[in-house]
């Protein structure tokens, strides 16, 4: 039941642009992640003196740069356009603006409290992203 929030035309355009940019963005992986199992894929900046990746040679993987970022106005928003608010109990729902924000129930919330949160959210007309 994910409805779209009240977004301006500009914000909708920027959300679509962000989606396109993310599709084109390469997956930034650690240098030589494929060579040694113990390294893992998580990004680490190459610091070696002779590192081809650090020197940005043509054939080597790309490194993260500010140019890969998403537009400032829609940065951090859920793909639906809502601003996510983490909720731990039903009382937290009262602080949410249903027009711009959506709730995400915290992972450590149990089944009973989760049910209470869902009922109260429906009552207040708040979207729950992980319902």
Curated annotation (Swiss-Prot):
One BP term from GO: translation
Chain coiled-coil ranges: none
GO molecular-function term, one example from the UniProt record: structural constituent of ribosome
One GO CC term on file: cytosolic large ribosomal subunit
Keyword line: Ribonucleoprotein, Ribosomal protein
Compositionally biased spans, kind Basic residues: 44-61
CDD domains: Ribosomal_L32_L32e (cd00513)
Domain of life: Archaea
UniProt xrefs under SMART domains: Ribosomal_L32e
Start and end residues of each stretch annotated as Disordered: 39-77
Alphabetical list of PANTHER family matching this protein: 60S RIBOSOMAL PROTEIN L32 AND DNA-DIRECTED RNA POLYMERASE II, SUBUNIT N, RIBOSOMAL PROTEIN L32
Family designation: Belongs to the eukaryotic ribosomal protein eL32 family.
Protein name from the UniProt record: Large ribosomal subunit protein eL32
């Amino acid at each position: 039941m994910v409805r779209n929030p009240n977004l301006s035309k500009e914000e909708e355009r920027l959300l679509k642009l962000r989606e396109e940019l993310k599709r084109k963005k390469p997956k930034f992986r650690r240098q030589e992640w494929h060579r040694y199992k113990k390294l893992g894929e998580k990004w680490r900046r190459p610091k070696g003196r002779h590192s081809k990746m650090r020197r940005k040679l043509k054939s080597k993987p790309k490194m993260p740069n500010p140019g890969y970022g998403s537009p400032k106005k829609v940065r951090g928003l859920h793909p639906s356009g809502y601003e996510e608010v983490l909720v731990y109990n039903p009382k937290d729902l009262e602080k949410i603006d249903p027009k711009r924000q959506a709730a995400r129930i915290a992972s450590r919330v149990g089944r009973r409290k989760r049910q209470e949160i869902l009922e109260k959210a429906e009552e207040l007309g708040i979207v729950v992203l992980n319902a």
